[in-house]
Amino acid sequence: MSNPTRFLSGVSTAYPNETLYSFPFPDPFHTGSTSGVGSSTYTNDFNTLIGTDFTVTGASSTFALANGLGGTAVLTPGGTTTASAAYKPATFMQFVAGNRMWYTTRIQASAVAGNVSLYAGLRNGASATEGLWFAKAAASTSINLVSTVNSTATTLVTGVATAAAATWVQLGWYYDGTDILVYANNNPVARVSAPTIGSTGTNLTNVLLSPVFQITPVATETLTTDFVLAAQEVTR
């Protein structure tokens, strides 16, 4: 790694007439590219985890920090075949035409054979009837991008990546306000052109969403997360 460029007076993204114009760091709540458009970002590298950050479902299931370089969190089902999820209870992300969104995460399952199923992405809190996530179905190792609107699931991209036991995979997408660009291990793999947004019969849901991790084991399989980022433009 080369030496960093030094901005001794700081770096600003604010307009001259704005409150944070002289603030020596980028405005964390607004974007300098378009006046009136803000930004909202959630990141977690899982070197810290507050107990109320995520709600865990599944009898006796846990979502807790584990030893690992850079920090990791492990979703451990409470029993064989116990469907288990960890999700942010307060929803804050929403697809809006014209406003950009970003999502990325790095995960690994301890095993993927048989009927182990899992997904990671954005969901409507406790409800699995709305969301957009990367999913591995039972009896498959294909990781697909799946959108669910009003309980109707649609596979937007098949074969984004291939799941393997105890193997990291980084998944992500970028919604540019019109199209969705899909990534696996930081490489572009697909584009979803002009998905529609709405409450029913559309490609994407218009409800509020938040990060989620889910696994349904067949024995003692776990799902480990290295990091997650969810960000979007917000009209403020």
Where are these regions (language model features)?
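Short, intrinsically disordered N-terminal pre-domain segments
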Residues: 1-22, 234-236
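Short, tryptophan-glycine- and acidic/Ser/Thr-enriched carbohydrate-recognition patches
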Residues: 38-62
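Extracellular beta-strand elements of beta-rich domains used
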Residues: 46, 105, 171, 225-230
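Secretory/extracellular carbohydrate-interaction modules
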Residues: 76-143
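Short, aromatic/His-centered strand-loop micro-motif at the edge of beta-sheets
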Residues: 148-170
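Short, solvent-exposed beta-strand-to-loop segments that form ligand-recognition rims
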Residues: 160, 187-208
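Localized edge beta-strand/strand-to-loop motifs within extracellular or lumenal beta-rich domains
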Residues: 167-181
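Extracellular carbohydrate recognition
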Residues: 216-227
